[in-house]
Amino acid sequence: MTKAGISFDEMKEDMLKDEEFRIEYEKLKPRYEAIEQIIRARKEQNMTQSELAKRVGTQKSNISRLESGNYNPSLDFLAKVAESLGKNLSVTLN
């Protein structure tokens, strides 16, 4: 547990115990995995949402919506986020 409360991983594990939630999560799994990677990369760099937004050239509210899953970003936007985090964007079709 972190100082701020329950960790993302703990929260996700707890929520996945609910069958209805788990089914919906599986449908949205690629989106949640991307969000999780973005949040993890940002936190590993001790970067705030505001700092990431500045690097990306967008508003903090867009980063907040992205991280909360309330935003359907373009590939170009995701590429900017990845680059701002020192990462590469990779898309795979299975």
Predicted regions and their residues:
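N-terminal flexible/basic segments that precede or flank functional cores
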Residues: 1-36
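Conserved hydrophobic/aromatic packing and binding residues within compact polymer-binding modules
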Residues: 38, 52-53, 63-66
